[in-house]
Amino acid sequence: MLESAELNFNADHGYLEGLVRGCKAGLLTRRDYVNLVQCENLEDLKIHLQTTDYGNFLANQATPLTVSVIDTEMRKKLCREFEYFRNHSLEPLSTFFTYMTCSYMIDNVILLMNGALQNKPVKDVLVKCHPLGHFTEMEAVNIAETPSDLFNAILVETPLAPFFQDCTSENALDELNIEILRNKLYKSYIEAFYKFCKNHGDVTAEVMCPILEFEADRRAFIITLNSFGTELSKEDRETLYPTCGKLHPEGLRLLAQAEDFEQMKRVADSYGVYKPLFEAVSDSSGGKTLEDVFYEREVQMNVLAFNRQFHYGVFYAYTKLKEQEMRNIVWIAECISQRQRTKINSYIPIL
């Protein structure tokens, strides 16, 4: 017998959950990837993708086909699916979808700010922005000279507004400060999303909290790695770490003091979930990077999310799995396009 919470979930969200599970069943299989890597050119790739759930999504594209066009059209297709889910959702699932879009909005804001710093035309940068992170005021981002300007003139009416509380300053938006701003926004965003899922409770919390804990810790590791050899102080580095992961508090304190990859690895060695990931990183050419092993772990967690029912995590997991699939296709397409077939199998299979 279903309990009342599960019955309510089915009544409000059961249709969409069934739909997203159907979409997940349409992800590319290992057999599909074997066929893709055997393609001689991008037209062959297009023909094979037509036999999958991607269908004729490239039918209206002029030849010769480019990797950029394939990437753009895949994003548009994902966006159409996501918007269908969101437009047919009820609260609190609608708010969950809004949280999902915030990460793309942050990336778009940073992309536009970097474009403005390099004096690139706004329309050229807008083309590169992710459609899931679109908001009305995006074109005005290039007028901001400080984080305070950015908030007051542009973002005050967007879902990003709450995440700017700890980010407003009068510092000039140079390359380093823009990257610091990105990480502060992500810290506030992940912590808020984690709190929302935890407060929601039930299976959604049981599935999403570990996923977001991993995402928080991954960001802490990557921030640390990217800060080596930069002007960022250890104290400032620590303020950028999200505090909702397994590393909090002691692991983050130790990570802030790390001065090289080996010291980072020693911190990871104290955590059962992260030790094998760092051990899988290879120094050799063509070996796995830290980013690779994090992506692999993310795929595993998102696949496992579908083993549970009656929760919002399937929507997050499907979107992340679809993004990994898109990265795989772009990687294979780039290798085909550039005739660099030696690394064509360095993708991350999902099913």
Swiss-Prot record:
Subunit of the V0 complex of vacuolar(H+)-ATPase (V-ATPase), a multisubunit enzyme composed of a peripheral complex (V1) that hydrolyzes ATP and a membrane integral complex (V0) that translocates protons. V-ATPase is responsible for acidifying and maintaining the pH of intracellular compartments and in some cell types, is targeted to the plasma membrane, where it is responsible for acidifying the extracellular environment. May play a role in coupling of proton transport and ATP hydrolysis. Regulator of osteoclast fusion and bone formation. Keywords: Hydrogen ion transport, Ion transport, Transport. Transmembrane segments: none annotated. The lineage of its organism: Eukaryota, Metazoa, Chordata, Craniata, Vertebrata. PANTHER family: VACUOLAR ATP SYNTHASE SUBUNIT AC39. V-ATPase is a heteromultimeric enzyme made up of two complexes: the ATP-hydrolytic V1 complex and the proton translocation V0 complex. The V1 complex consists of three catalytic AB heterodimers that form a heterohexamer, three peripheral stalks each consisting of EG heterodimers, one central rotor including subunits D and F, and the regulatory subunits C and H. The proton translocation complex V0 consists of the proton transport subunit a, a ring of proteolipid subunits c9c'', rotary subunit d, subunits e and f, and the accessory subunits ATP6AP1/Ac45 and ATP6AP2/PRR. This is V-type proton ATPase subunit d 2. One of its GO terms (biological process) is vacuolar acidification. It comes from Bos taurus (Bovine). Pfam families: vATP-synt_AC39 (PF01992). GO terms for molecular function: proton-transporting ATPase activity, rotational mechanism.
